[in-house]
């Protein structure tokens, strides 16, 4: 259980990653060592209980791009498991959380904070299946604060009195972790405390666009922090924007980076058959080697594949969500 003492330890400089490697009795499966091969096509016994597969897509980029990226993935799921498969793009992160609560979706790739929110909203009715690994095999990414390169802002001190866009209230990298980290550094995150104003950009892509269009002085978003910075790194929102022609990295400056954050999981409902959840795991563990183009599309870049996780790996984010909710109640 994450306690206030453990949060204090984190505030003293510990990483934002759980100690997955310390597990004594469980070895997570990884794509790199997964030898079972890609699942053979065919309708499964669990299909009587799961007659359709509904996949939630988090907000953060425009709907047409999301549907385009996941089109081949949807077709592969449908072909493999023999059940109609539909994509449900939400306008924001909250839409996916609400869909889980209403049992309107079976699976969704979530950020760590969004998973924690879904777990709280459903009273433990969702569980994580796996997370993406980065190019070096790690399972973390970074939150970064970006400004326009021509803004004259080169560090956090120069953000005093400037405006800041959060990405989404249910995003770890675009809200929860930067707020926690900035408060830890003695920087007030409420409007008028340090920044002249703060607001929500409407998603990661939209928040960066708002900076480029001078609607905000800075925004927070996510990146792997690995690979060629000129290309937006190896994976993340900046990578995707560069690939879509929406961003030239020369137009941005990164002025702040978080500590490593655990990658968000693929989440599913706990009331679904165990065989279904296992098949979804096996499908994804084998996907990067069997269908590398589809894997790179849905991950907005590449890595070494996927790794199994458990709920306990995300307990820190559950506690941070509770702390944030308590702080919000105190403000009101």
Predicted feature descriptions by range:
Residues 55-80, 113, 138-208, 213, ...:
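Bilobed "Venus flytrap"/periplasmic-binding protein-like clamshell domains
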Residues 6-25:
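N-terminal export signals
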Residues 98-158:
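Acidic, polar ligand-binding/catalytic clefts
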Residues 24-72, 268-332:
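An extracytoplasmic/periplasmic, membrane-proximal ligand-sensing/linker region
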Residues 165, 169-273:
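Pocket-lining segment of extracytoplasmic ligand-binding domains
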Residues 54, 59, 91-93, 104-122, ...:
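Beta->alpha turn/N-cap motifs
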Residues 37-116:
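Extracytoplasmic small-molecule ligand-binding "clamshell" domains
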Residues 58, 128-144, 201, 236-278, ...:
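Periplasmic-binding protein-like
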């Amino acid at each position: 259980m994450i306690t206030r003492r453990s949060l204090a330890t984190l505030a003293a400089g510990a990483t934002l990653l759980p100690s997955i490697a310390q597990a004594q009795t469980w070895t997570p499966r990884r794509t790199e060592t997964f030898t079972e091969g890609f699942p053979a096509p065919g309708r499964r016994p669990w299909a009587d209980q799961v007659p359709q597969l509904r996949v939630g897509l988090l907000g953060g980029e425009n709907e047409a791009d999301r549907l385009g990226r996941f089109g081949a993935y949807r077709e592969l799921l449908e072909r493999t498991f023999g059940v109609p498969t539909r994509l449900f793009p939400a306008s924001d992160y909250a839409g996916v959380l609400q869909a889980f609560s209403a049992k309107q979706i079976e699976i969704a790739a979530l950020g760590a904070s969004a998973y924690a929110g879904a777990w709280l909203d459903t009273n433990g009715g969702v569980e994580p299946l796996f997370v993406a690994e980065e190019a070096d095999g790690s399972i973390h990414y970074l939150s970064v604060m970006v400004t326009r390169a021509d803004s004259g802002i080169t560090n956090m001190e120069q953000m005093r009195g400037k405006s800041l866009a959060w990405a989404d209230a249910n995003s770890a990298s675009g809200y929860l972790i930067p707020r926690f980290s900035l408060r830890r550094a003695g920087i007030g995150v409420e409007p008028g405390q340090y920044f002249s104003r703060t607001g929500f950009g409407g998603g990661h892509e939209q928040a960066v666009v708002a900076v480029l269009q001078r609607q905000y002085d800075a925004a927070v978003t996510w990146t792997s922090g690995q690979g060629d910075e000129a290309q937006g790194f190896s994976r993340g929102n900046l990578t995707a924007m560069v690939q879509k022609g929406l961003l030239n990295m020369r137009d941005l400056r990164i002025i702040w980076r978080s500590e490593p954050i655990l990658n968000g999981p693929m989440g599913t409902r706990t009331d679904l058959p165990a065989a279904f959840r296992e098949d979804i795991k096996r499908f994804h563990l084998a996907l990067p080697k069997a269908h590398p183009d589809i894997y790179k599309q849905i991950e907005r870049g590449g890595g070494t594949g996927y790794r199994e996780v458990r709920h306990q790996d995300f307990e820190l984010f559950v506690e941070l969500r509770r702390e944030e909710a308590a702080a919000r109640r105190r403000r009101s």
